[in-house]
Swiss-Prot record:
<feature type="region of interest" description="Disordered">
    <location>
        <begin position="169"/>
        <end position="339"/>
    </location>
</feature>
<protein>
    <recommendedName>
        <fullName>Protein Jumonji</fullName>
    </recommendedName>
</protein>
<dbReference type="InterPro" id="IPR036431">
    <property type="entry name" value="ARID_dom_sf"/>
</dbReference>
<feature type="region of interest" description="Disordered">
    <location>
        <begin position="354"/>
        <end position="548"/>
    </location>
</feature>
<feature type="compositionally biased region" description="Basic and acidic residues">
    <location>
        <begin position="418"/>
        <end position="440"/>
    </location>
</feature>
<dbReference type="InterPro" id="IPR003349">
    <property type="entry name" value="JmjN"/>
</dbReference>
<dbReference type="GO" id="GO:0048863">
    <property type="term" value="P:stem cell differentiation"/>
</dbReference>
<dbReference type="Pfam" id="PF02928">
    <property type="entry name" value="zf-C5HC2"/>
</dbReference>
<keyword id="KW-0156">Chromatin regulator</keyword>
<dbReference type="GO" id="GO:0035097">
    <property type="term" value="C:histone methyltransferase complex"/>
</dbReference>
<feature type="domain" description="JmjC">
    <location>
        <begin position="882"/>
        <end position="1046"/>
    </location>
</feature>
<dbReference type="GO" id="GO:0001889">
    <property type="term" value="P:liver development"/>
</dbReference>
<dbReference type="GO" id="GO:0048538">
    <property type="term" value="P:thymus development"/>
</dbReference>
<feature type="region of interest" description="Disordered">
    <location>
        <begin position="1"/>
        <end position="22"/>
    </location>
</feature>
<dbReference type="InterPro" id="IPR001606">
    <property type="entry name" value="ARID_dom"/>
</dbReference>
<feature type="compositionally biased region" description="Polar residues">
    <location>
        <begin position="304"/>
        <end position="322"/>
    </location>
</feature>
<dbReference type="Pfam" id="PF02373">
    <property type="entry name" value="JmjC"/>
</dbReference>
Length: 1234
């Protein structure tokens, strides 16, 4: 360091345990400072180079007595030497100052200035704890010579701070971001694994740094971070640590994790008898005297407070620890520093990260998730951890060993990592397993580790927000472990209520991250195939949950070979006979088929809000309470159209009211400062911004007035609400029957068809509820004007429905426009609200049906349907991209020559794929496609999906059962079932209906066959893509379905007449006999119906007509004046009958004055009603002769007589009757395609 460097005025910090920054931060700072303290380093070398070996021996000799001092931040030795520590410079982590009191005090002012400078850099990488390690290395001379290798200047340090993590950083400065032992790992045989663990956790911010006076404690007798063998260290490349240190985004969370790892390690020390296990435990377990040598004061000193949260240091061990005295161990003070710490409620680790990484084999390059256990993965919610939970983290279960129990206690745990560690090594405890200890464990008698003494203190995990009392530290502690026997299950039970699901949900659900993709995991490219474990998964889950689920069979799982996996329609046709009886099958592609999913994180779509507790029966205790609150608010002039949102999650007002009263009312909650606890009980995510302020605001706005009512007034409100419900049900039947189809049945799109972000049956809140007298149904306002008598009736109906229960029959509402990133955050928050740890599909399934059936709490989730024409597909579409032309790419499937839907062109929700974006509990209710079309669904990324399927053959039985269950007052059962009603498969199975089930995982297809009833429940955030297909076998079923939809006045997404005529024209040219023979009978029926209706209209007096796309020059003057020429250019989607929603393709009748469209059947009714054809005009696409000729040509080809269909269409046809005056022939080339 240059002597001309100006000194800074530094405010002296108090050297108290509760002051300053934690040692993890101190180590990080000193790591960086080491590179800029060349002079001091040289001086230390000269002064202590000769006596280093002797000091190490002295350290080893004092290990037995030193452990007592190592057991707390306020240990006896640190108290006695506090004055000496004040003389020791801040870089006492250097060679000898870290081990001896007589360290050079002359450097202290300068070093404190340096430390202060470094503290202002919260994201500065850690590169200096090497000093702590160096004196511990067995060959001190070699280590000292290594110290002098690097001679950075202050200017270099500043350059590194500015350029770290960027390509502009000079190669010569790369080593700034890592400890020296990482770079010299091949040269230094005895370098410490612990230092490498420290560098792994280098990303620590200055948010919680313990007092600087703790420096000498970490260093005194503490050069014990070595001992790991070279071979063990060489197994882990140094780039892992650099990659972690070079990620600034991780640094603000990692320092709390570092502290908690220290505490966990100290709390996880082995018992006296477990020598083998203790070798794999935290570093503090080494120099411990017998507990009898401790005073109560010593035990109290074990618990030190850091930022108001207690920190547990390791306690004394039994006699077996003497066997380890020969090994170099951390000093008493250093032991404290390397234990897990809870800082501001966040569990953090410093020391054990490397050892844990090596044992659990985590994804090293994922931010803030160094291990599969998700303490580090939960970036935002992990601050819910407390002292007691950290103690549980350090514990080990009796059967699985320390590694398993230590991981189990982490709040959101990946169970696979536990099993992996338990099988691999049972020596590690509390996430602390240095390689030195692993080596030592092999040398120590293994029978000495009784598993029962490795019990963790998991029993304390349930108490969030509580400080650990001194008594908790004084419970029979051996090597920092509470000897309390806690069953292994309690480790999982005691996890905090809201463990962060964000990282787990993302890390586990998504199958990889591509560059440029944020943590929302939009990309699903996987380096490894995820198909192999899929098939076995289905079997264990088959009967999971309740016993009644055992009656469900799993749908077939198909694994086509690479050769078979080419054309989806050919493959599906080959297996149809075996799988169609199940209604559905799951297809697992070959391992090498894994297209990458790239979605724009900022794409926006309109969500759909689903009230899970209302998906079954609409009425329940929660809904009743909410109705009372709404009724009271309405009497106060307050309208609550939507529930208040906190963190994107709807607030459960009914539960809020109940809980705040159970806690004594608002005044008591405020006086006792229990708003935080109340928010936790309501499961509001801790990551939600201003959650307490919003919670209090919601109470004052919506509950305060209701809460102030007397019990009598509450009972009166309940009676009024129940009476209103009874009246409503008498008038309209049960709430489940008041579906959106009553007011907007014609908005009911196919169950999977997206339209403006809405799905099947989502109704705007101000929908029409009128019924036309002539047809008994409410026409949908799709034309440009409403029908004549509609307006007055609509007003009357809306006035009737102004009651508080007018929309309580709904369970699905229109949401708001959100980006994909916002949707993911909401999904993460809702997952955290519903589950405290990463749930398995069986757990989600059980909780889902509990919510649906019990209806005791308000659960609102979101989902979205996005047209890929607007936002792009999840499949690759570029010509040069892999899989972009593959047959199973769902953007290619609509053009497959085996699918007759290709003749329709681009139809949203039919031949254009759409994305299904869901979160936990997102539901596709029981339904079948309204056209009975088959479809293929591919799960791009994310959590699993649970599918239920009822084969088409069960239709009649299902209708009777549903009608009985829902008591539909004459409403057909299937109509009620398709009105967003979820009935448990268990109930249906008990009624004798075949229900099949499967769990679709990422990268798998689900194929649904025509007419099957299907429902789906998402297990977390995921993205899938779906598209329809159809073969010629479907046409007969599709034709009958189209007639039924017309009868029920349901809008179809495409015209069946158009499809049949397009097939006839295209296939007749190819002389495709099988296809033509299938559609010939349907064309016959269609021709007869069309010509009969035209004849009846002509007889009724409708003589004015025109052909599509032509300008009628021969029409009368009166007709010419009123003809809306612009209307003739309207698209097919707008040419719907205003009565029955039929798509008019062959012909229609137009009310020119009102610009209203009728199909021929509804026009006949209108003419009979009005007794006049005034203002009406027939519009047609083909005249009678063309229709007859086309059908004859098709029938002729089927019977073997070949003729040209082109001649039939192009030859002039005789014009008969009054039509010839108002008709202009247009050749087929001028006909619009739509």
């Amino acid at each position: 360091m240059s002597k001309e460097r100006p000194k800074r005025n530094i405010i002296q910090k108090k050297y108290d345990d509760s002051d300053g920054i934690p040692w993890s931060e101190e180590r990080v700072v000193r790591k960086v400072l080491y590179l800029s303290l060349k002079e001091f380093k040289n001086a230390q070398k000269r002064q202590h180079g000769e006596g280093l070996a002797g000091s190490l021996k002295a350290v080893n000799g004092l290990l037995g007595n030193a452990q007592a001092k190592a057991l707390g931040p306020a240990s006896e030795q640190s108290e006695n030497e506090k004055d000496d520590a004040s003389q020791v410079s801040s870089t006492s982590n250097d060679v000898s100052s870290s081990d001896f009191e007589e360290g050079p005090s002359r450097k202290r002012p300068r070093l404190q200035a340096q430390r202060k400078f470094a503290q202002s850099q919260p994201n500065s990488p850690s590169t200096t704890p090497v000093k702590i390690v160096e004196p511990l290395l067995p060959p001190p001379a070699t280590q000292i010579s290594d110290l002098s290798k690097r001679k950075p200047k202050t200017e270099d340090f500043l350059t590194f701070l500015c350029l770290r993590g960027s390509p502009a950083l000079p190669n010569s400065m790369v080593y700034f971001g890592s400890s020296q032992d990482e770079e010299d790992v091949e040269e230094e045989d005895d370098e410490t694994e612990d230092v490498k663990a420290t560098t792994n956790n280098a990303s620590s911010s200055c948010q919680s740094t313990p007092r600087k006076g703790k420096t000498h404690k970490h260093v005194h007798n503490g050069h014990v971070f070595n001992g790991s063998s070279r071979s063990a260290r060489e197994k882990e490349p140094a780039h892992k640590h650099r990659s972690k240190e070079a990620t600034p985004g991780k640094e603000k969370h990692s320092e709390p994790r570092a502290d908690s790892r220290r505490e966990q390690a100290s709390g996880a020390q082995p018992t006296a008898a477990s020598a083998a296990a203790s070798s794999a435990k935290g570093l503090a377990a080494n120099h411990q005297p017998p507990p009898s040598h401790r005073s109560a004061q010593d035990l109290r000193k074990q618990v030190s407070k850091v930022n108001g949260v207690t920190r547990m240091s390791s306690l004394g061990a039994g006699t077996n620890s003497a066997k380890k005295i020969r090994e170099v161990r951390p000093s008493p003070s250093k032991t404290v520093k390397y234990t897990a710490t809870v800082t501001k409620g966040t569990v953090t680790y410093t020391k054990a990260k490397r050892e844990l990484v090596k044992e659990t084999k985590p994804n090293h390059h994922k931010p803030s998730s160094a291990v599969n256990h998700t303490i580090s993965g939960k970036t935002e919610s992990s601050n819910a951890k407390t002292r007691k939970q950290v103690l549980s983290l350090g514990g080990a279960s009796k059967s699985t060993g320390p590694a398993a129990s230590g991981l189990k206690a982490s709040s959101r745990l990946n169970p696979k990592s536990c099993t992996k560690e338990v099988g691999g090594r049972q020596l590690r405890e509390g996430l602390r397993n240095s390689k030195r200890r692993l080596e030592e464990a092999q040398q120590v008698d293994k029978p000495q580790s009784p598993p029962k003494k490795m019990k963790g203190v998991a029993g304390n995990a349930e108490a969030p927000g509580k400080k650990a009392s001194a008594a908790s530290g004084e419970k029979s502690l051996l090597n920092g472990h509470v000897k309390k026997e806690v069953p292994e299950r309690s480790l999982e039970r005691n996890r905090p209520k809201r463990a962060a699901a964000g990282k787990n949900m993302l890390g586990k659900q998504a199958h990889g991250k591509t560059e440029g993709t944020p943590c929302e995991n939009r990309s699903t490219s996987q380096p490894e195939s995820s198909h192999k474990p899929h098939d076995p998964q289905g079997k264990p889950e088959k009967g999971s949950g309740k016993s009644g689920w055992a009656a469900m069979d799993e749908i077939p799982v198909l694994r086509p070979s690479a050769k078979e996996f080419h054309d989806p329609l050919i493959y599906i046709e080959s297996v149809r006979a075996q799988v169609e009886k199940y209604g559905m099958c799951r297809v697992i592609p070959p391992p090498d088929w894994r297209p990458e999913c790239k979605l724009n994180d900022e794409m926006r779509f309109v969500t759909q809000i689903q009230h899970i507790h209302k998906l079954g029966r609409r009425w329940g205790p929660n809904v009743q309470r909410l109705a009372c609150i709404k009724k009271h608010l309405r009497s106060q002039g307050i309208t609550m159209d939507e529930l208040p949102l906190i963190g994107g999650c709807e607030l459960d007002l009914a539960c809020f009211f109940r809980l705040i009263n159970e806690m004594g009312g608002m005044q008591q909650v405020t006086d006792l400062k229990k708003w935080n606890k109340l928010a936790d009980m309501l499961r509001i995510p801790k990551t939600a911004q201003d959650r307490l302020a919003k919670l209090q605001e919601a109470y004052c706005q919506y509950l305060l007035s209701y809460d102030s009512l007397s019990p009598e007034e509450h009972r009166r409100l309940e009676k009024e609400v129940l009476m209103e419900k009874e009246i409503l049900e008498k008038r309209k039947g049960p709430l489940e029957g008041h579906t959106e189809s009553d007011h907007h049945k014609f908005h009911s799109l196919p169950r999977f068809e997206p339209k403006n972000g809405l799905v099947h049956g989502v109704t705007p809140r101000n929908g029409f509820r009128s019924k036309l007298k002539e047809v008994g149904r409410a026409p949908l306002k799709t034309g440009r004007r409403r029908l004549f008598a509609q307006e007055k009736e609509v007003v009357k109906e809306e006035e009737e429905d102004k009651g508080v229960l007018n929309d309580f029959h709904k369970c699905i509402y229109k949401g708001r426009s959100v980006s994909l990133t916002t949707f993911y955050r909401t999904a993460r928050n809702i997952m955290n609200m519903c589950f405290s740890k990463e749930p398995a599909p069986a757990e989600i399934e059980q909780e889902y049906w509990r919510l649906v059936e019990e209806k005791d709490c308000h659960v609102a989730v979101h989902c979205g349907k996005v047209d890929t024409n607007t936002h792009g597909s999840g499949f690759p579409v570029g010509k040069s991209e892999p899989f972009s032309r593959h047959g199973w790419n769902l953007t290619v499937l609509p053009n497959n020559t085996g699918s007759i839907l290709r003749h329709l062109g681009a139809v949203p929700g039919v031949t254009i794929p759409w994305l299904n974006i869901g979160m936990v509990f997102s539901t596709s209710c029981w339904s079948r496609d309204q056209n009975h079309l088959p479809y293929i669904d591919y799960l791009h990324t994310g959590a699993d999906c649970i599918w239920y399927c009822i084969p088409a053959e069960e239709e009649n039985k299902l209708e009777d059962v549903v009608h009985t269950l829902l008591q539909g007052n004459g409403t057909p059962g299937l109509q009620m079932l398709e009105s967003n009603v979820m009935i448990s498969p268990e109930v249906l199975c008990k009624k004798g209906i075949k229900v099949h089930r499967t769990v679709q995982q990422s990268g798998q297809f689900v194929v649904c066959f025509p007419g099957s009833f299907v429902s789906k429940v998402c297990c977390g955030y995921n993205v899938s893509e779906t598209v329809h297909f159809a073969t010629t076998q479907w046409t007969s079923m599709g034709f009958e379905t189209a007639k039924e939809m017309k009868r029920r006045h349901i809008a179809k997404p495409f015209s069946m007449e158009k499809l049949l005529y397009q097939i006839a024209q295209a296939e007749a040219k190819k002389e495709n006999g099988p296809t033509l023979s299938t559609i010939s009978a349907l064309l016959d029926e269609l021709r007869d119906t069309e010509l009969r209706q035209r004849r009846l209209l002509f007889e009724a007096g409708l003589h004015s007509s025109a052909r599509y796309g032509s300008h009628d020059g021969n029409s009368t003057v009166a007709d010419g004046k009123k003809k809306p020429r612009k209307w003739l250019q309207l698209e097919t989607s707008e040419r719907r009958c205003q009565i029955c929603q039929h798509l008019c393709y062959l012909s229609m009748v137009v009310q020119e004055n009102e610009n209203v469209v009728f199909c021929l059947e509804c026009a006949l009714r209108h003419v009979e009603k009005q007794k006049s054809c005034r203002g009406l005009k027939l519009m047609y696409r083909y005249d009678e002769e063309q229709i007859i000729s086309l059908v004859n040509q098709i029938c002729g080809k089927v019977s073997g007589k070949h003729g040209g269909i082109e001649n039939c269409l192009n030859k002039p046809t005789p014009k008969r009757g009054p039509r010839k005056r108002a008709t202009v022939d247009v050749p087929p080339s001028r006909l619009p395609s739509s």
